[in-house]
Design a protein with these regions (language model features):
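Positively charged, polar, low-complexity stretches
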Residues: 2-81
Length: 81
């Protein structure tokens, strides 16, 4: 998704759970501009996942198997909790 705009990402951060809306939206606003391309791809990947999985990673303490995705989860939890 190389042509995805911040406005499109902001819209995709709106989920079915208020907690996810806040965490994802806050990371986008605080960290997106300074994120490297790998972290940006991981964030776009994260937005494609079902809400229960995202909640398990961000709130439930579980981790995705991919190291890059896990690093993004750690970054969101560290900077947006």
């Amino acid at each position: 998704m190389p042509d995805t705009t911040v406005a499109q990402l902001r819209w995709r951060c709106r989920r079915g759970m208020k907690e996810l809306d806040l965490l994802l939206g806050e990371w986008l606003e605080r960290r997106w501009d300074g994120a490297d391309p790998g972290k940006r791809r991981s964030f776009q990947w994260l937005l494609e996942q079902p809400d229960p999985e995202i909640a398990a990673w961000l709130i439930g303490g579980l981790r995705p198997g991919d190291a890059g995705h896990a690093a993004l989860i750690d970054d969101i939890v560290r900077h947006c909790h």
